[in-house]
């Protein structure tokens, strides 16, 4: 069986400081793994390398048996990420933020017309419902909602893509234990 993701001798330096050194890992289709380490150990950096946001100093990342740089847009669109720092746009509504994940996934030009597409709103609402977000916040500006709601909006934005590969960087850190367990069960 060919691995879905393969890391060969991945290293990363930042300002001459080694953040990652000679990481080797193979993940087969259907497998779920967790990266566990202390704060500052490089977990977020590794996820940033895996999804193409950062370039490793040394080594090779293969996804679908190809170096990341050789993936086509269709393959890259099958990769989603939930970030610990959320990366939401405060001036947009909850549903518009969720739709951003769908629009970026399809390499569409980011326009107000695309954000107001009815079918994408319906899909966004399904994802937000799945993450137990009440319909009363769909059209609310992010400045007016809680941290836990923002966390679930970020999760909704990632799952709207229907990714085959989902990287999650502390995706439940702003949630109460009940919601955390509910969402963990969705992903496991």
What residue ranges belong to the model's regions?
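Conserved catalytic motifs of ABC-family nucleotide-binding domains
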Residues: 162
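Catalytic Walker B motif of ABC-type/P-loop ATPase nucleotide-binding domains
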Residues: 166-169
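Helix-to-loop junction immediately C-terminal to a conserved catalytic motif
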Residues: 51
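Conserved ABC ATPase signature
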Residues: 141-145, 149
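ABC ATPase NBD coupling module
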Residues: 67-83, 117
């Amino acid at each position: 069986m060919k691995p879905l993701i393969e890391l060969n001798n991945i290293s990363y330096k930042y300002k001459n400081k080694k953040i990652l050194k000679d990481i080797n890992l193979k993940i087969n289709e259907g497998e779920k793994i967790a990266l566990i380490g202390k704060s500052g150990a490089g977990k977020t950096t590794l996820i940033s390398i895996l999804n193409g946001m950062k370039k490793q100093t040394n080594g090779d990342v293969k996804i679908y048996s190809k170096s990341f740089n050789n993936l086509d847009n269709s393959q890259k669109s099958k990769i989603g990420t939930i970030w610990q720092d959320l990366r939401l746009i405060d001036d947009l509504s909850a549903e518009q933020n969720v739709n951003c994940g769908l629009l970026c996934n399809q390499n569409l030009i980011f326009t107000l017309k695309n954000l107001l597409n009815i079918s994408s709103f319906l899909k966004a609402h399904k994802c937000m419902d799945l993450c137990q977000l009440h319909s009363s916040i769909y059209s609310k500006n992010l400045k007016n909602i809680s941290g836990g709601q923002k966390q679930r909006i970020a999760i909704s934005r990632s799952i709207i893509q229907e990714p085959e590969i989902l990287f999650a960087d502390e995706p439940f850190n702003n949630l109460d234990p009940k919601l955390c367990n509910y969402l963990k069960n969705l992903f496991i």
